[in-house]
Amino acid sequence: MGEAIEPIVTQELAGLGFDLVELRRGGSRARPVLEIRIDRRDEEKVTIDDCARVSRALEARLEAAALVGEQYVLEVSSPGADRPLRHAADWRRFVGRRATVTSGLLAGGKQEVEIVAVTGEGGAEVALVRDPKGREVSVPLREVSQARLAFNWKR
């Protein structure tokens, strides 16, 4: 399963009204696993029926393009409570929420912060985050190596 999979998955999902949140490859050579996390473009919750519909469509498309072998596992799911923040649109959508962010610009390199605002566009987006001590820090999104929503048990 090469790098050619992601553009095909992204295109197929867009046609169905979904966005690709995360694509992971795992398993073994004999039985590869392709994990796909999706989100609805209308920002409604992803249902089991959504996952089944996407799975059927992706399976047909991936097999037709000969991008997967005969013995593979395709897992389609919602992004979950600790969804990754990969794009500026993700950051904007979750302003006011807490996220675990890895960046050399944060004390210790990794912190749970509150997303206060996101400014800029075209690859120059900057997130204003509030650290655990209440200090606000500007972090260019290109300087973030990983970010995930932090699960809040109180919600």
Swiss-Prot record:
Keywords: Cytoplasm, Ribosome biogenesis. GO terms for cellular component: cytosol. InterPro entries: Ribosome_maturation_RimP, RimP_C, RimP_C_sf, RimP_N, RimP_N_sf. The keyword Cytoplasm applies. Belongs to the RimP family. Required for maturation of 30S ribosomal subunits. This is Ribosome maturation factor RimP. It comes from Gemmatimonas aurantiaca (strain DSM 14586 / JCM 11422 / NBRC 100505 / T-27). The gene is rimP.
